[in-house]
Structures are given as structure tokens and as C-alpha cells.
Regions:
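Short, surface-exposed basic-aromatic patches at helix termini and helix-loop junctions that form
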Residues: 16-18, 123-132, 148-163
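Short, positively charged, Gly/Tyr-enriched micro-motifs
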Residues: 1-43
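Acidic, metal-coordinating catalytic cores used for nucleic-acid/nucleotide bond scission
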Residues: 137-148, 166-168
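A short acidic (Asp/Glu
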Residues: 23-25, 36-37, 74-76, 146-154
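Electropositive, glycine- and tryptophan-enriched low-complexity nucleic-acid-binding patches
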Residues: 83-126
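Short, surface-exposed connector motifs at secondary-structure boundaries
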Residues: 8, 101, 126-136
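Short, conserved catalytic/metal-binding motifs centered on acidic residues
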Residues: 12, 63-68, 138-143
């Protein structure tokens, strides 16, 4: 709850009778351990591949990627001011399969072009999987594409498909 809301460990402990702040803090730290969420996301994707209903959501060869801004301290090295909220934030670039599994995420500097993060996520995923489970298409927004990025994507064997703004 503390990670998913704007409450801290003390606030969550106050909501649950019999739970101490130290227990909540320890649970939060265990979730923050290196690669813990990455491995959990991989297990979810594995489960989805075996589940017949998830196969109705898609074949798993397409994904989308976008950045989310997460509040951060101004003292964090890669924190920048989020232009929408006017607070310091760090970017989290996330790749999501068409079957809704999170296959890759990485922190990035806010307000930067995101095509390199988009390409890296697909390449990391494709390297870990066999040929039949690789991505063939990644949908991104305007910040996630450049001409160089589209060229590199083609050379790596997948399509980088931008949703371009103001096309009408």
C-alpha cells in the first residue's frame, strides 16, 4: 500500500491495527531490492503465456512503451522538473505487452528523447526469449521515436511505430 499510494510506512501502519512501522519499512525495502520487481514481472508474463484466456489478448509479439514521471528529490542526480506538475521527477520508461504483462522498465532522465530506452527494452526482451516469442512491433509516442531509432529498430528486426502528433 505504501508504494502504491502517497502514504509512507508510518501512515500505512496507522491504518492497520497490530502492524508496526518497522514491519512496513522492512516490507518496502524487500520490494525495492535489486531485480525483485523485474523477476516478479517475468513470472507474471510466464503465467500469462500458459493461461488460455491471455492468449485471446494477443500473441505477445507486440508491445507499447511510454514514460511515467515519478516524484523524486531534487538532490537525485537524474531528477528534472516535470513541466506539467512543476515538481522534481524522474522518468520510468516501461514496456507493456499487448497481453498487459510488463516486460521491461528502466529509470531515465525526465524530458529527454526516449528512443534509446525504447530500443533497449525491446532488445533486452528479445535477447532473453526464443525466436517465437520475440517482439516484432513496438508502439511509442512522439517522444519515443527518432529517425535514427526507427532505422536501428529495423536493423534489429522489429518495427518502431510512433503515434505522431498533429498529423491532421
Amino acid at each position: 500500500l505504501a508504494h502504491g499510494t502517497e502514504n509512507d510506512a508510518k501512515g500505512v501502519a496507522a491504518m492497520i491495527p497490530g502492524i508496526e512501522v518497522a514491519h512496513i519499512s522492512a516490507a518496502m525495502r524487500s520490494l525495492e531490492a535489486r531485480d525483485r520487481l523485474r523477476k516478479a514481472n517475468e513470472r507474471v508474463v510466464e503465467f500469462q503465456r500458459k493461461n488460455p484466456i491471455a492468449q485471446l489478448w494477443g500473441t505477445g509479439d507486440k508491445a507499447s512503451a511510454d514514460m511515467m514521471a515519478l516524484d523524486a528529490s531534487q538532490h537525485l542526480y537524474n531528477a528534472r522538473v516535470d513541466p506539467r506538475r512543476r515538481t522534481f521527477a524522474v522518468g520510468l520508461y516501461t514496456h507493456v505487452l499487448e497481453s498487459y504483462g510488463v516486460i521491461y522498465d528502466q529509470p531515465i532522465v525526465h524530458n529527454e528523447r526516449q528512443s534509446s530506452a525504447a530500443l533497449e527494452g525491446v532488445e533486452q526482451y528479445n535477447v532473453r526469449n526464443e525466436e517465437s516469442m520475440r517482439l516484432s512491433l513496438l508502439a511509442v509516442d512522439t517522444h519515443g521515436y527518432t529517425y535514427v531509432g526507427m532505422t536501428v529498430a529495423k536493423l534489429l528486426g522489429f518495427d518502431l511505430c510512433p503515434q505522431l502528433r498533429n498529423m491532421a
